[in-house]
Amino acid sequence: MTFPPLKSLLKFYAVVPTADWVGRMVKAGADTVQLRCKTLHGNELKREIARCVAACQGSRTQLFINDHWREAIEAGAYGVHLGQEDMDTADLAAIAAAGLRLGLSTHSVAELDRALFVHPGYIASGAIFQTTTKQMPTAPQGLDKLREYVEQARGTPVVAIGGIDLNNARAVLATGVSSLAAVRAVTEAANPEAVVKAFQALWDG
């Protein structure tokens, strides 16, 4: 079971709730975007994911679909992002056979080791700071622990997530992670497009 490698660095990674948001992130030039949709099901969900895929076509943006791996395969998405609990139920072999990239969430050393065992395209580590976006199973990891995770990942790209904004972004990036993911820093911003460009400038100058 082998997952395709990432086509390019993930860099700034926007996590958004709808296809409309995905389209905005693509137009703003985000390198990576994840659809984290918790409200739609069935055909509505399939249509939403198809809209996301269409929005990313012809762009450099890499699209990951959170959780809904069957629909992501059907729509021809770039990749799938799964949580630890999803690893028990998702058909990883089917995801790999369909040519989708895989990202996995981790919150501890044990989960990191488990994720690395299946050789994903990247692992996400968090929450780095306190966050209200979702209920987390562990306390905030902090920068020192994140730095240790980067070392233990042994070259697998690490995406930092959880409470990251433009005020702490440089400090997080200094730990050696290859990507910064943001949720509220984008979706609750007065000018989300400007926030994307400011994050992108951390890599692109």
UniProtKB/Swiss-Prot annotation:
Its cofactor is Mg(2+). It catalyses: 2-[(2R,5Z)-2-carboxy-4-methylthiazol-5(2H)-ylidene]ethyl phosphate + 4-amino-2-methyl-5-(diphosphooxymethyl)pyrimidine + 2 H(+) = thiamine phosphate + CO2 + diphosphate; 2-(2-carboxy-4-methylthiazol-5-yl)ethyl phosphate + 4-amino-2-methyl-5-(diphosphooxymethyl)pyrimidine + 2 H(+) = thiamine phosphate + CO2 + diphosphate; 4-methyl-5-(2-phosphooxyethyl)-thiazole + 4-amino-2-methyl-5-(diphosphooxymethyl)pyrimidine + H(+) = thiamine phosphate + diphosphate. Mg(2+) binds at D67, D86. It is an enzyme of class 2 (transferase). Pathway: Cofactor biosynthesis; thiamine diphosphate biosynthesis; thiamine phosphate from 4-amino-2-methyl-5-diphosphomethylpyrimidine and 4-methyl-5-(2-phosphoethyl)-thiazole: step 1/1. Belongs to the thiamine-phosphate synthase family. Condenses 4-methyl-5-(beta-hydroxyethyl)thiazole monophosphate (THZ-P) and 2-methyl-4-amino-5-hydroxymethyl pyrimidine pyrophosphate (HMP-PP) to form thiamine monophosphate (TMP). This is Thiamine-phosphate synthase. It comes from Neisseria gonorrhoeae (strain ATCC 700825 / FA 1090).
